Amino acid sequence: MNFETVIGLEVHVELKTNSKIFSSAPAHFGAEPNTNTTVVDLGMPGVLPVLNKRAVEYGMKAAMAINCEIAEHTKFDRKNYFYPDNPKAYQISQFDKPIGEHGWIEIEVGGKKKKIGITRLHLEEDAGKNTHTSHGYSLVDINRQGTPLIEIVSEPDIRSAEEAYAYLEKLKSIIQYTGVSDVKMEEGSMRCDANISIRPIGQEEFGVKTELKNLNSFNNVRKGIEYEEKRQAEVLKSGGIIEQETRRFEEATGKTSLMRIKEGSDDYRYFPEPDLVDLFIDDAWKERIRAEIPELPDKRQIRYINDLGLPAYDAMVLTLTKEMSDFFEATLAAGADAKQASNWLMGEVSAYLNAEQKELHDTGLTPENLAGMIKLIEAGTISSKIAKKVFRELAQNGGDAEQVVKDKGLVQISDEGALRTIIGEILDNNEQSIIDYKNGKDRAVGFLVGQVMKATKGQANPPMVNKILLEEMNKR
């Protein structure tokens, strides 16, 4: 029996506000444990939450960016549960009236585009963090408690691990463009749970789902889904049944393990938050927030293809992160050719960032010095090979491209007389290569070009070398 996988993703994104959603405590990452707290975060008796307007507006902006309808009337609710990192014994969230509903984003997998529906986007507060020690006790840090979150719940429209990966990449890109979050999974500002079920191909009814947690990277989301697909298929093929449960992805083994039997929403005993009034959002407020949304990646891709003549793949890669796209645009503004700038950013720059595990802002590269280097290549001042040395110097130490070329003595040798002298000496020492060339062995030319480049430390003008080399060999 063959099965179809049905996946829905729940993504939590921390909003980049200065203070928490219901208190005045700072909301930044990395502080000493239990220092970013107030009596509100600690759930002390008699204290009242105060709603952070900026968090609401960030939620509206994110919802609009993923094509959600913004509610005219929304409210907050108490989600009741006890856990050490939740001092109030309830979480303030949104239950039946979320701030955004009925959205969608478009993904592309294997050259095919597909719309993934968004059920809802709602606001809530984050919980604290437990650290379990090997000494039989746990440590609780309340710093994260009360940090504003949006939870984005997809429709069960995702059919594979690859589609889930593409959805997360696209969602991260869109949220990053809006500026409402850093969406850094390594810092916990973007987290994902996956709901996975399988059903026989052709069956309309959904299978029993399991919720998968501890997915701390996009790769782990993919691996967790792939494992869970196989596990559920094996259970059904052996005559077993799938239990509705929450499972943990174990990165060390690549497998999932049982955490607990899955709770339903009734288990949380939701009821309206009595300490916060309902929120009404009028059209004027919506339009003001909508006007603040910048050009999003899909529109930039279209502009890069239509206005700059870039291939669709280049446009997609360049717009995947706002930092890369903004850097590209600034490089063009500094005078670089669009295709050359695209090639460098997608090639050498991306390879360097991956190898060094850095972001663009962590390097010495600027749009101005990258554009300056590209213009030196176009002017024939340096070759593409020498440019790689210049690029590495700029990436590591910054500076001006032209000055680096001068200081390092990297100017391309384009003097015909000098090149003829060098080539003449090389031919004198490689008579067999001349004979091979005249006998039709083209690789002899490549060998001689390599000798010229070696003698000039890669600084000879390649087209001139080829031209002069052929002329000199044909004379002999």
UniProtKB/Swiss-Prot annotation:
Its EC number is 6.3.5.-. It is an enzyme of class 6 (ligase). It catalyses: L-glutamyl-tRNA(Gln) + L-glutamine + ATP + H2O = L-glutaminyl-tRNA(Gln) + L-glutamate + ADP + phosphate + H(+); L-aspartyl-tRNA(Asn) + L-glutamine + ATP + H2O = L-asparaginyl-tRNA(Asn) + L-glutamate + ADP + phosphate + 2 H(+). It comes from the Bacteria. Pfam families: GatB_N, GatB_Yqey. One of its GO terms (molecular function) is asparaginyl-tRNA synthase (glutamine-hydrolyzing) activity. HAMAP family: GatB. Heterotrimer of A, B and C subunits. Allows the formation of correctly charged Asn-tRNA(Asn) or Gln-tRNA(Gln) through the transamidation of misacylated Asp-tRNA(Asn) or Glu-tRNA(Gln) in organisms which lack either or both of asparaginyl-tRNA or glutaminyl-tRNA synthetases. The reaction takes place in the presence of glutamine and ATP through an activated phospho-Asp-tRNA(Asn) or phospho-Glu-tRNA(Gln). This is Aspartyl/glutamyl-tRNA(Asn/Gln) amidotransferase subunit B.
